Structure formats: C-alpha cells, structure tokens
Amino acid sequence: EYLQEKKVPFVTIGSSNYTGVIQIDHNHKSACKELTSIILMKGMKRIALIGGDENHVVTQSRLRGFREAYEKMGEVIDPTMLFLNLDNHVVIDKIVEEVLERKAECILCMDDAVCSRVLKKLREKHVKVPKDIRVASFYNSSVLENNVPSITSLSFDAKELGMVACKTVLDVIEGAEVETRTLLPY
C-alpha cells in the first residue's frame, strides 16, 4: 500500500490478494490439477493431501487445482484425507502415521518442505516409497532432487520468474502497459 501511495514502481513475485498490484507467478492451479489428474488416472483412489497454511495464496491455488482434478475425473475427495494448516514437524509426523493407518495409496504434499518431512517419517517407519506408498509433491527443489528414489514433483523455473519480474518492472518504469497478472508455465 505504501509503495502504491508513493507511486513507486514494483511487481510482486508470487500471487497476492492485493488489488492493483502487478503479479508474476507460476500457474500453480493448472500444474497441481495436472499432477493430481495423472495420479488419479493411474488408478489411485486413497490420496492424502498434506500441506501448510491454507491462508497462503499459493496454498489456495494448489488446493483449487487439486479439487478441479477430482471434479474433472468425476471423483470425490475424501475429506478425511485432507490435512492442511500443518505448521511443525511433530504434527506432520502424526499425520503421516494417521495416513498410513488409513491405508493411503499416495501422499500428495503441498510443497518440498512438507514432502521432505513426510519422506523422513516414512524412512523412520521403514515404509518403502514407491513400493508401500507413493509420494508426490506440488513443488520441487534441491531438497527433493537428490532423493532416492526420485519423487514425482512439479518443477517451476525460479530464474525465469525473476527475469520476467525484472523485465516487467523495467517496462513499468518506462511507462509501458503491462498485464496485472502473468502466469508462467511449469
């Protein structure tokens, strides 16, 4: 708000609920819809979704994609397999145990940090991925890239995000018309 009041040119990297703010982000909703659809097409029905703060715009976008995939595939989400607002390792560990008791076929993690913790807990319990349970993530990072076995995850190009944001803010400074929201591919 301060930057807008002072007419300082800026863009946000990531999505925001602020109106009139130029946003550059990846298309999280579409990416998560596609990954969830693929998992459903592989015949998995008992999918647990584990994630963080649902007040975050990125979590909301990813959740919309997840829901849209179920709708597109004509499937019904089991609300007892949705676990959001998990904010610490202890809670995530407890949820992993609960998901295993509920015989989930796949754990779908909202991001790499959650996924990393899920994998650690599965290793501690001697649960084999993908033999005993499948694991996928809505966000990839170096944390997951080196995991053995590899984890199916969505990759977003952070370098491209920065370059597009830089070009956009330069265009704003030069007075050019720019889109208020730019969604990049995955």
Task: Give a label for each model feature.
Residues 4-186:
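Bacterial carbohydrate/catabolite-sensing allosteric modules
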